[in-house]
Amino acid sequence: KGILQFDMWGYEEKELMHEWKNLKNMIKKYGVRNSLLVALMPTASTSQILGNNECFEFFTSNIYTRNTLAGDFPIINKQMVTDLLDIGEWNTETKDLIIAGNGSIQHITSVPTIFKRLYQTQWELKQIWVLKAAKARGPFIDQTQSMNVFMEEPNDQKLNSCLFWGWENGLKSGLYY
């Protein structure tokens, strides 16, 4: 039929970045093997070994220590370090302030606001943005995406709000475990 995942979300080709008509015509003619290809899952161990963040998650902390059976490994947000180096703000004092702030840079007065906004941790970010990012990815994920929301003071109202927002906006699964 030439129907792709984003078609089932009600998107029209003119709203998308690329032209899909030729691919859809080829699918109509030849079909698709392994048609369910995209499922975004947590990649904790692999990402930490490679010095990346987990899948599409926001950083839970800009600096922390990963404890494993093989030893303890420091995890540092490389992009943040690069940006702070570029403006002359990455040094031992800044590193120590981030560690003292549980991985946050929000309290460091010498860090420009643009970087404070860019490098908010998962705990500092309004969770509606996490949900909106999941919705934006949804039309291009044919299986599912495994994501987390972080609440310092969770309650029934906050949790229900997140779950219902996801359901109302077409996210495929509300809970697992």
Labelled PLM ranges:
Residues 1-26:
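Short glycine-cluster motifs
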Residues 13-17, 26-177:
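Catalytic alpha/beta core of large soluble enzyme barrels
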